[in-house]
């Protein structure tokens, strides 16, 4: 079916364009199934036009990473990451020591921190204490270091997981991780921080 809403996006002449999770609903780490979903998505004429004309950056969420509400225990997550690297033209993902789909890019006076809220995530149902993680310690350190060293006027943290008070599948049920981000921004007096989610 035609997806004319993509033309509404193009009419705004965006630069850049971000897809913030659940770009498809494969709900598996099986690379063959994921690949079919990625190809189907790109065959959509309107979306293909966006990709050809607008710099596009992408982060995943549960459905394009693995099963619904999946986390760092997902079997085959390494295959998901390998496939993600093949289909999206993001900058280098993760770090030398920490795998994942997270990365940073800059546009004008804005630094975007695309965080991976799946690869190192603790299961939703474990106790909501100071052992429960949304990003994992290494990725959190990467984020904090990036925010502290950024000279951009605005720093945008981008994640497929919502920051609001929903008690389903978002930062709200990761109290320690959520407040660790807030507290670090306050402690280090980092200005211009915003949060974006899909």
Task: Enumerate the predicted regions with their spans.
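Metal-dependent phosphoester/phosphodiester hydrolase catalytic core
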Residues: 1-198
């Amino acid at each position: 079916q035609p997806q004319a809403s993509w033309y509404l996006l193009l009419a705004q002449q965006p630069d850049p364009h971000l897809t913030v999770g659940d770009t498809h609903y494969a709900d598996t780490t099986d690379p063959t199934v994921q690949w079919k979903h990625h190809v189907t998505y790109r065959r959509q004429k309107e979306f293909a036009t966006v990709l050809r004309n607008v710099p596009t950056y992408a982060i995943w969420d549960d459905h394009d990473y693995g099963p619904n509400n999946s986390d760092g225990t997902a079997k085959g997550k390494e295959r998901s990451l390998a496939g993600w690297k093949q289909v999206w033209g993001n900058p280098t993902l993760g770090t030398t020591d920490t795998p994942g789909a997270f990365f940073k890019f800059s546009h004008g006076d804005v630094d975007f921190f695309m965080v991976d809220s799946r690869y190192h995530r603790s299961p939703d149902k474990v106790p909501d204490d100071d052992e429960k993680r949304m990003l994992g310690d290494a990725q959190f350190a990467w984020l904090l270091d990036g925010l502290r060293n950024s000279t951009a006027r605005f720093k945008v943290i981008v994640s497929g997981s919502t920051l609001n008070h929903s008690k389903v599948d978002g930062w709200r049920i990761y109290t320690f991780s959520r407040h660790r981000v807030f507290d670090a921004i306050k402690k280090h007096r980092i200005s211009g921080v915003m949060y974006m989610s899909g």
